Regions:
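Thiol/selenol-based redox catalytic cores and closely related redox-interacting motifs
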Residues: 352-448, 462
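Alpha-helical membrane-anchoring segments
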Residues: 2, 6-7, 14-355, 368, ...
């Protein structure tokens, strides 16, 4: 019979492995980093694909000279895509642009990612022309991991705004997507290094970097200032090649060790900039790899940084946004505003709860507070209506994308009129059936008395 201690030790090993697996991949952690990484992925895909659309007749339409990649796609897919009429190609172009935009802003994030991924590889199957296969292979793995879940839509997205999730940056999700993205980057670097010393690689016994330096100017190497000088020093080129090889092996280790991560991330970003400055490498390496390195930062550290910013803002003093707490539409708007106010710059205040409005600002009156939202900044500046929104767009990080639009010449003229129209027709935007005839009707209790906290008879338009 087996010794009981042997059996126990045999059981203990799988249990420890299960615990490690759970800690590494399944433990629930904030998904804030994935929301930020989504923006980098959207930018990378757009930068990779959109320039090719400027020459549709040369790249994709029936007039284009196309090449295909049978080592990447099955032949039946290549034949199917090759038969696409021009109208279908234009339709896929529109599908790609719409899905890219919705993915970037985080609207129906997972579905948008799926459609964007299919559209991207439709065009790659149509013509692979100058697009490097390696870059599309790397991008495919990243996009598939992003398609698996919608976790990247938890933060910095219209999806979180629709949910009214004030704690979106703290939302806990299984960590496996972020962990797999980390592993993708680690193994990409190690694969590149191993390829230099195996499977025909000769960086240890030969001097490939020296040969690259001496290629014609139109080759792989850019015409950077030290190129001609390096071409005259083959020994130095060999030493630089060995240094590069060692760097590609060691850099992922710096990311994996918590204490060395800051140094590893800084070196990794500098390395990508150096590659871009000296070699004609695919832009995906510069646009995607540095954000992937930032995924090694603990998401809890990102949350703590956000909370520290909120605490500093509270100590300096917040702006006050006056709204009508008896207006259902206003309450919903304030709920969305809290999602946009990541760093706690604004303190919403129901003007009904302020007995003396003039104590806040001499020009404040109940009538004005009912007619428009009012923003009172710590320096005493008071803005109302569209102008209050314009000021918010400069202060709230999640509204910064609107700032250039609302400050264009003529935007104030249009914006004030749109605001007034919304003020007059806000019942069209409210799902509550008690809102009718542009008034928030007072719901009556069984004895005929108005319910406290119900929708009041306010003409307040926008909060």
């Amino acid at each position: 019979m087996l010794d009981a201690s042997v059996v126990q030790s045999a059981i203990r090993i799988p249990q420890s492995a299960i615990q490690w697996w759970h800690q590494a991949f399944l433990v629930r952690r904030p998904s804030v980093s994935l929301g930020l990484f989504r923006l980098a992925v959207a930018f990378t895909v757009g930068a990779h694909m959109i320039p090719s659309f400027f020459e549709m007749d040369e790249n994709y339409l029936a007039t284009a000279f196309t090449t295909q990649n049978p080592s990447f796609f099955p032949l039946w897919i290549l034949r199917l895509v090759a038969g696409s009429p021009d109208w279908l190609i234009w339709s896929w172009t529109l599908v790609f642009l719409v899905s890219l935009a919705t993915f970037a802003v985080g609207l129906f994030t997972q579905a948008s990612c799926l459609v964007m991924t299919v559209a991207s590889y439709y065009f790659y199957a149509l013509n692979n022309y100058h697009i490097g296969t390696l870059s599309f292979d790397i991008l495919l793995v990243t996009l598939i991991l992003m398609c698996v879940t919608g976790f990247h839509g938890d933060f910095l997205s219209l999806d979180s705004l629709r949910r009214g999730d004030v704690r979106a940056h703290k939302r806990l999700r299984p960590f496996f997507v972020q962990r797999l993205l980390q592993q993708q980057l680690v193994w990409t670097f190690w694969y590149t290094a191993l390829n230099k010393i195996s499977a025909g690689g000769n960086w240890l016994i030969d001097n490939p970097y020296y040969y690259l330096i001496r290629y014609p100017p139109i080759g792989v190497v850019r015409d950077f200032p030290l190129r001609n000088w390096l071409g005259q020093h083959p020994t130095l080129c060999y030493q630089l090649g060995l240094t590069l090889l060692a760097f590609e092996f060691l850099l992922p280790l710096l990311w994996l060790i918590p204490r060395t991560r800051p140094v590893g991330i800084a070196l990794g970003v500098a390395f990508q900039l150096m590659l871009w400055a000296t070699l004609h490498v695919p832009t995906i390496f510069l646009f995607l790899f540095p954000p992937m390195m930032l995924l090694f930062i603990r998401p809890e550290a990102v949350v703590r940084w956000i909370e520290a910013r909120q605490a500093r803002q509270a100590a300096r003093g917040r702006a006050v946004l006056l709204y009508d707490g008896q207006c259902g539409f206003c309450l919903e708007s304030v709920k969305r505003l809290r999602v946009l106010d990541l760093f706690g710059w604004v303190d919403p205040l129901d003007f009904h709860a302020q007995p003396d409005l003039s104590a806040l600002h001499p020009s404040l009156t109940p009538e004005r507070c009912r007619s428009e939202m009012l923003l009172l900044e710590p320096n005493g500046r008071l803005s109302g209506g569209f102008y209050a929104f314009a000021r918010l767009s400069l202060r709230l990080p999640l509204l910064l994308g609107c700032a250039p639009l609302v400050h264009l010449p003529g935007a104030a003229w249009i914006g004030t009129r749109v605001y007034r129209w919304v003020a007059a027709h806000r019942d069209l935007f409210h799902r509550n059936p008690t809102c009718a005839t542009n008034q928030c009707a007072i719901r009556q209790a069984g004895n005929g008395a108005p319910l406290q906290g119900g929708a009041g008879g306010s003409s307040k338009a926008w909060s």
